[in-house]
Amino acid sequence: MLLLLLLAPLFLRPPGAGGAQTPNATSEGCQIIHPPWEGGIRYRGLTRDQVKAINFLPVDYEIEYVCRGEREVVGPKVRKCLANGSWTDMDTPSRCVRICSKSYLTLENGKVFLTGGDLPALDGARVDFRCDPDFHLVGSSRSICSQGQWSTPKPHCQVNRTPHSERRAVYIGALFPMSGGWPGGQACQPAVEMALEDVNSRRDILPDYELKLIHHDSKCDPGQATKYLYELLYNDPIKIILMPGCSSVSTLVAEAARMWNLIVLSYGSSSPALSNRQRFPTFFRTHPSATLHNPTRVKLFEKWGWKKIATIQQTTEVFTSTLDDLEERVKEAGIEITFRQSFFSDPAVPVKNLKRQDARIIVGLFYETEARKVFCEVYKERLFGKKYVWFLIGWYADNWFKIYDPSINCTVDEMTEAVEGHITTEIVMLNPANTRSISNMTSQEFVEKLTKRLKRHPEETGGFQEAPLAYDAIWALALALNKTSGGGGRSGVRLEDFNYNNQTITDQIYRAMNSSSFEGVSGHVVFDASGSRMAWTLIEQLQGGSYKKIGYYDSTKDDLSWSKTDKWIGGSPPADQTLVIKTFRFLSQKLFISVSVLSSLGIVLAVVCLSFNIYNSHVRYIQNSQPNLNNLTAVGCSLALAAVFPLGLDGYHIGRNQFPFVCQARLWLLGLGFSLGYGSMFTKIWWVHTVFTKKEEKKEWRKTLEPWKLYATVGLLVGMDVLTLAIWQIVDPLHRTIETFAKEEPKEDIDVSILPQLEHCSSRKMNTWLGIFYGYKGLLLLLGIFLAYETKSVSTEKINDHRAVGMAIYNVAVLCLITAPVTMILSSQQDAAFAFASLAIVFSSYITLVVLFVPKMRRLITRGEWQSEAQDTMKTGSSTNNNEEEKSRLLEKENRELEKIIAEKEERVSELRHQLQSRQQLRSRRHPPTPPEPSGGLPRGPPEPPDRLSCDGSRVHLLYK
């Protein structure tokens, strides 16, 4: 993009600007050249779309010619834009021409003469072959290049071989696993024997020597291999090289071989640990390292967009080191191994763990016998199908899952169902091109020849896929020994002089092996610095019970060749994990609307009651009910009812940024509504209890109720709430929190899980604040119930509606005491919690308004008591007699006056009694006592008429009523 910006002024300049130029040039750049036929041009730094959008390229810009298929550029491969607007070497055209194989231009132990063309060999070129002395040509001596093909097979030079009876034997010690974890020896041993026959029949390779094989069955067991290694080393004849098969056996053999100066060449070992040259200094293998699978696996993960994988491995060094390498590679690619399981012999528990962890993309690393155990457990756990993809090793037998295995209890049909659709990555072990190898056989001819040699079907033969590697291993050894020995007649060492103390011959064999490069039946054979084979990777998929090739990957060039023949059970590659969709549980809108309508009607009712109370505040009956407190009750009910609206608001209506404000609105509206509504009723009942009860014991408390005390009490309750809420909001404000529930699996989509979430208003110390709030509110409710019960029999006109207040307190307290804990328990059920809380608010508000205000409305309407106090005093006597309030007031006044007179009379009586007692004592001192008269006491005088103010009990009792 930066390059395009820099070149934009050049590209946008009109073609005719800048003076006279040649038709294909401009002073500011060069015109784009058309690519040659069967070829193209590589524009460095530009994409294909960018190239289509421009016509000129800047000065000093270079283009490169490339050709398709088996063609090469003839002429300049690179051209550069000159300052004069022309390209370099325009007098020489660049063409893409078909070439013949370059392998015909060299001949081992001979010379090639090219006529009729230059290198590379073009159509019409001719080559003549000549062998060196002591060699003779096998095949045609001339070949002609025509349409990219040579007219005859490539010949080779054979040495004039020593007679067979005079050739010296060179022994190879081999360990073939005929059974065990990988029974690769079943096919690899016949392949090795084929290679020995072919090598020994050649006159140009080891003409003075004959390779012979001494072998044992290692059973892919290091313990068994140790026994046979001892026999190979300590029994004659001397072996010049060792050839193990399994990685576990190769690890043992290769680590010990250096002590006997032996080269180790393996045909079936893939353990990455064997690439350690310090630990295994003399080790080579024609089987590529298992780490060669990992770049292919990572490439496929990226192709299908997988970012999370799981692994299960058999606990052996080869698989552990392979998995360690895979972990490093996926980490570099931004892919995560979420779950890693291993097992020694029983994979049941690891497979269950994979199922429990919802693993989807699973890489399995284990031998063939363990693979059957794993997939039997996979079938039992249903860990297969369109949700899962398994990546396995590709060197199992093609029908490995159909082979009878007494260690598992799954049928062939069950195993076939479990393995369907899995992917294998396999080293290309058979040359896909039908070209002739150094043995003068094509790969197809090799397969046919080996199949005839085997005693059973190739699919039932272990190691059949690795057989080409074993065949090429013998050829690599033969060529290295041939180079070490001098190739017959030339200077070299005597192989028969080798012994376990002769490091010189070992070093020469090592150098010869390290420089190996030839075409084998498995492809081009070459070893890297660690002694491992370099090769392509074949990607296959099990489709309908048989493996189908779906691609190749060349890790050295990062080139993925895809055939687009992959098939998926679900129609497409599955997701690497269950897609978790977070969904919020919102309040039922029908419930919210219904309760909102009830709340709105309640607010209207509160406004009507408030208006009624204010309008009739001059009426004595309304005045005696403390109308201002009733007004506060109506306002409190309105605020509480208004709290229903923010209580039902959630993410369905508002954004997350507005949620804290809604939380505060809920808290303040409900808190202040309760304080005003319930606080004013509590104040009434408190003062009724304080002033108008226990009058016999505390008559001095019978005072006139002062209104300011009522308002002060309400103010104290509201102030406590305001202070508490303010501190709460400042110190630990409410905010939006998310409650997450268990995942839900929808039936219609297998790769999606629903993660329900619920929004809450909460704070860090939510439980502490609720404890404080509910604590003193609960005490007020309980105290209100107690006071309402204590004052139920009190009759007073100062607060004439205290019984209605008590009834309202009962209802509010019961609803609140039940609803508060229930809503806390049901907080995770948004509909139930909202229904309980909102309906409790609505019902308590409705009950309070109806109980307090409806009787007053009914009384004023039915009795017509709409007069004020001034109007009431101007009424006639009949009206006065009908006014119970006035009579009550007059009787109370008279009662107080009579009580004062009675107290004075009682004091006078007490004083007279004291005087009488004093006189009696004085008389008794002057005259002796005389017997009392039968009547006793003082002489009775005429009875006095009862005084109007005498302390008659019935009268006093009447006054106290």
UniProtKB/Swiss-Prot annotation:
Residues 30-96, 98-159 form the Sushi domain. Baclofen binds at residues 247, 270, 287, 367, 466. Its main location: membrane. Highly expressed in brain. Weakly expressed in heart, small intestine and uterus. Isoform 1A: Mainly expressed in granular cell and molecular layer. Isoform 1B: Mainly expressed in Purkinje cells. Isoform 1E: Predominantly expressed in peripheral tissues as kidney, lung, trachea, colon, small intestine, stomach, bone marrow, thymus and mammary gland. It is found in: Cell membrane; Postsynaptic cell membrane; Cell projection, Dendrite. One of its GO terms (molecular function) is G protein-coupled GABA receptor activity. InterPro entries: ANF_lig-bd_rcpt, GPCR3_GABA-B, GPCR_3_C, GPCR_3_GABA_rcpt_B1, Peripla_BP_I, Sushi/SCR/CCP_sf, Sushi_SCR_CCP_dom. GO terms for biological process: adenylate cyclase-inhibiting G protein-coupled receptor signaling pathway; gamma-aminobutyric acid signaling pathway; negative regulation of cell population proliferation; negative regulation of dopamine secretion; negative regulation of epinephrine secretion; negative regulation of gamma-aminobutyric acid secretion; negative regulation of synaptic transmission; neuron-glial cell signaling. It is a multi-pass membrane protein. Residues 613-631, 689-710, 790-804, 855-961 are cytoplasmic. Residues 888-916 are annotated as: Interaction with ATF4. 4-aminobutanoate binds at residues 247, 270, 287, 367, 466. Belongs to the G-protein coupled receptor 3 family. GABA-B receptor subfamily. This is Gamma-aminobutyric acid type B receptor subunit 1. It comes from Homo sapiens (Human).
